UniProtKB/Swiss-Prot annotation:
Gene3D superfamilies: Immunoglobulins (2.60.40.10). This is Beta-2-microglobulin. Disulfide bonds join C45-C100. One of its GO terms (biological process) is antigen processing and presentation of peptide antigen via MHC class I. It comes from the Eukaryota. Its main location: secreted. PROSITE patterns: IG_LIKE, IG_MHC. It is found in: Secreted. Residues 25-114 form the Ig-like C1-type domain. The lineage of its organism: Eukaryota, Metazoa, Chordata, Craniata, Vertebrata. Belongs to the beta-2-microglobulin family. Keywords: Disulfide bond, Immunity, Immunoglobulin domain, MHC I, Secreted, Signal. Residues 1-20 form the signal peptide.
Length: 119
């Protein structure tokens, strides 16, 4: 029993140190299918490799927050960093600009990554 308590305490102590680790998120913005003007598609913002888990992600159209956005559950990798996918249906055209804005403790100000229709 004492051995179990010692091992459990060691595990808890090692995990408690994870909160002090900070990793900036990697942000990727892309469409599900190649962009075609006037053809419905999905805009994706994949945010990965970040720690701690507190994060705010917004998809933007012409600099304004898109309200109807869905996202995956918060998940973590083998290295205990987190990842998320935010997505929404959209219809690309030549005049509108789309982006993903991320706020995280590792950024002094929110970081915005624009969607490149040629990627």
């Amino acid at each position: 029993m004492a051995r179990f308590v010692a091992v459990a305490l060691l595990v808890l102590l090692s995990l408690s140190g994870l909160e002090t680790i900070q990793h900036a998120p990697k942000i990727q913005v892309y469409s599900r299918h190649p962009a075609e003007n006037g053809k419905p598609n999905f805009l994706n913002c994949y945010v990965s490799g970040f720690h701690p888990s507190d994060i705010e992600v917004d998809l933007l159209k012409n600099g304004k927050k898109i309200e109807k956005v869905e996202h995956s559950d918060l998940s973590f990798s083998k290295d205990w960093s987190f990842y998320l996918l935010y997505y929404t249906e959209f219809t690309p055209n030549e005049k509108d600009e789309y982006a993903c804005r991320v706020s995280h403790v590792t950024f002094s100000t929110p970081k915005t990554v624009k969607w490149d229709r040629n990627m």
